[in-house]
UniProtKB/Swiss-Prot annotation:
The keyword Disulfide bond does not apply. Its main location: virion. Structural component of the virion that presumably stabilizes the groups of hexons but is dispensable for assembly. This is Hexon-interlacing protein LH3. Homotrimer. Interacts with hexon protein; this interaction tethers the hexons together. Transmembrane segments: none annotated. Coiled coil: none annotated. Belongs to the atadenoviridae LH3 protein family. Pfam families: Adeno_E1B_55K. It comes from the Viruses. GO terms for cellular component: virion component.
């Protein structure tokens, strides 16, 4: 083709365009419309869930639900709908009827869970408030909660409670997943019992919660979360924790707590009280990371960024682990008004076992830290 023959109107076409043949009609089921099961706010949710394994909520709608008990798998796609709890709950309780619930899949996606009243900050958690939750999973495995919002829950927004029976089957199949979710204004974000293990709670955001992770069960990956204006990011004590369940302090705590951002836990934003009452009536003074269990070991602790986020290591098992290291973290605190803000504190009983390696920081208080156990040296040792 010469330049004289080249079309100005169609400069990139050298040959006539071959038209596509007209689409032929087909009775193939893949081309037919599919009726998705949409649950409307005025329908009975329990009856709907009993007859459907998948449910779609109506976009923009608000559902006023409480105490929906199910013993079957379900996938619920919220499409941005709101589910509101009024009074005691929880909204959902899943309880498997099987000893080994290997195929009990539950999925929540893109739902806004909210309680009608904000927690009373000056008050304490009590037995009557523990049911003010969004979802309880009791002996249920393989659950996923993705792209959901949880707001104003006066108890734990999510509770995972598994039995010990799975040990005999050697299945290790809890496999819970919480990802890309937001928790705002909750007393507790996520709680798990002593037999709820091998799960992931990562890439979530927590704002204005008193406790983000109320940790009993071990072997969870709690990484890459953003935690702002919350008094405590991670709490584990050996006895009398809330939401222990029947398994209590069974095989707890150990796992990973890495690459989290923890800002304004004890200064500059948090408005929750530091004092926290346990189930026996005793109280502790929360820190952004608080660990006190002489029978167990803390999680792997690496890459966390603390901006006024204090740490308190009260006790851990020195027979199960000879040394425990905090590595690659950043610690910033210490203002003129609060010179111990953001401090890293280790109890006298375990101070020789704690090492701080490769961390950065300003002149934040390092209380009871052995200078020879820290490289490079950061902060002000007291």
């Amino acid at each position: 083709m010469t330049s004289a023959e080249f079309s100005v109107e169609f400069p990139y076409v050298s040959k006539p365009i071959v038209p596509w043949p007209a689409s032929a009609s087909s009775n193939n089921s893949s081309s037919q419309n599919i009726d998705f099961p949409v649950l409307k706010p005025d329908q009975d949710p329990i009856a709907f869930f009993q007859t459907n394994n998948t449910a779609y909520l109506q976009p923009g709608a608000t559902y006023y639900w409480k105490c929906i008990e199910l013993s079957k798998p379900i996938h619920i796609y919220g499409q941005g709908a709101t589910v509101q709890l009024v009074g005691p709950g929880p909204v959902f309780v899943f309880n498997s009827e099987s000893v080994i619930p290997e195929d009990f899949y539950v999925v929540f996606e893109n739902i806004n869970f909210i309680e009608d009243e904000f927690p009373i900050r000056s008050g304490q958690l009590s037995l009557g408030l523990t049911t003010h939750s969004a979802v309880w999973f009791i002996n249920v495995w393989k659950t996923s909660i993705v792209n959901c919002n949880f707001k104003n829950f006066r108890g734990a927004a999510l509770w995972y409670s598994d039995n010990r029976n799975f040990w005999n089957a050697r299945k290790w199949n809890q496999q819970h997943l919480v990802s890309n979710c937001r928790f705002n204004g909750c007393r507790i974000g996520i709680s798990n019992t002593g037999s709820s293990e091998y799960s992931i709670a990562s890439q979530n955001q927590f704002y204005d919660c008193q406790i983000c992770f109320n940790v009993t069960g071990g072997n969870w990956s709690r990484n890459n979360n953003v935690i702002v204006n919350c008094r405590c990011a991670y709490l584990h004590v050996g006895d009398n924790m809330w939401y222990e369940g029947h398994s209590e302090n069974n095989n707890p705590a150990k796992g990973t707590f890495c690459n989290n951002i923890i800002n304004h836990a004890d200064n500059g934003g948090n408005v929750w009280p530091t004092q926290f009452k346990l189930t026996d009536g005793s109280t502790i003074q929360l820190a952004s990371f608080y660990f006190d269990d002489n029978q167990e070991i803390p999680p792997c602790y690496s890459g966390n960024f603390h901006w006024f986020g204090d740490v308190n290591i009260v006790n851990f098992s020195t027979t199960k682990i000879d040394k425990w290291c905090i590595t690659g973290c950043n610690f910033y605190g210490n203002t003129h008004a609060a010179n111990d803000a953001g401090q890293v504190q280790v109890a006298e009983a375990v101070k020789d076992k704690v090492f701080i390696i490769g961390c950065s920081g300003n002149n934040v208080t390092m209380k009871n830290i052995v200078e020879g156990n820290m490289t490079p040296k950061i902060g002000t040792i007291k």
